[in-house]
């Protein structure tokens, strides 16, 4: 999707000598590098809450140092970051939501259910709340709520009950412990479909640890506030919960505010934004496999 993201942002960045683009999830710097190479006059602000990723992107983007500003922050802070830099608005914003393959591959960070690791899952290692904080302290009801809402897991109550039992017995110390608890909580017929049975619970705990959906809900309206006239916002979402939020915010932003029954649409009621295309586009099989 990298080339497609660059193409979608292109109309806002082409033939501009003063355009600023925000890569709100700069990660390893791949999308940022593609944008900087394609549009030699733009300046880029790269934001990431993951310090490890930010340092790697610094290396990736070292040839563009004079045009790049890297910030350790969450993307809901975009307006404050721009104000600090003296920037009133930007021509483009790119979001690549969810977890990265780099984070999954670093087994010690606890994002993977296939390798024994501490119960961490923090994207920002300086945050105080980890997966262990949640798993060891949340009530059964709160655990079930998180797993059901953020993992869309129909066996959430049973999983939560078994987590509480395991922690009381001192048998919940690692990611593989959690994965085994989840597996034992799901009936055998249900385990045979949908991939690893721990996937949904790990997603749910990770989202709760990092407050991913709450931050996204705050960030998108703020992104709309700082985008310039004829600017573009591109969002890559990976799962249905993110996708739902993005579609809801964009649908509201592109809707006329004209009262029902008014014979004509007044200028002040017109939508301030329009969708570049309706619906969504799908990554190819290779990228989907890498993201998993």
Residue ranges, per PLM feature:
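S-adenosyl-L-methionine-dependent methyltransferase catalytic core, i.e., the SAM/SAH-binding region
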Residues: 1-292
């Amino acid at each position: 999707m990298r080339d497609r993201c660059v193409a979608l942002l292109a109309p806002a960045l082409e033939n501009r000598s003063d355009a600023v683009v925000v890569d709100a999830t700069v990660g390893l710097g791949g999308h940022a590098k593609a944008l900087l190479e394609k549009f030699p006059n733009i300046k880029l602000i790269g934001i990431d809450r993951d310090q490890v990723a930010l340092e790697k992107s610094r290396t990736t983007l070292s040839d563009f140092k004079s045009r790049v500003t890297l910030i350790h922050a969450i993307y809901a802070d975009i307006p404050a970051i721009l104000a600090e830099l003296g920037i009133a608005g930007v021509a483009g914003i790119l979001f690549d939501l969810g977890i990265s393959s780099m984070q999954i591959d670093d087994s010690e960070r606890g994002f993977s259910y296939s390798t024994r690791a501490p119960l961490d899952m923090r994207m920002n290692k300086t945050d105080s709340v980890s997966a262990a904080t949640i798993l060891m302290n949340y009530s059964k009801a709160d655990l079930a709520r998180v797993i059901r809402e953020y993992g869309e897991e129909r066996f959430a109550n049973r999983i939560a009950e078994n987590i509480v039992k395991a922690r009381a017995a001192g048998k919940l110390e690692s990611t593989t412990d959690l994965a085994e608890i989840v597996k034992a909580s799901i009936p055998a017929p249900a385990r045979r479909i949908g991939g690893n049975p721990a996937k949904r619970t790990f997603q749910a705990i990770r989202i709760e640890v990092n407050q991913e959906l709450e931050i996204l809900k705050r960030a998108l309206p703020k992104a709309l506030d700082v985008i310039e006239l004829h600017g573009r916002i591109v969002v890559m979402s990976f799962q249905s919960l993110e996708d739902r939020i993005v579609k809801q915010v964009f649908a509201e932003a592109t809707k006329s505010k004209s009262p029902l029954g008014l014979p004509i649409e007044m200028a002040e009621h017109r939508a301030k934004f329009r969708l570049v295309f309706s619906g969504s586009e799908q990554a190819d099989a290779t990228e989907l496999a890498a993201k998993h």
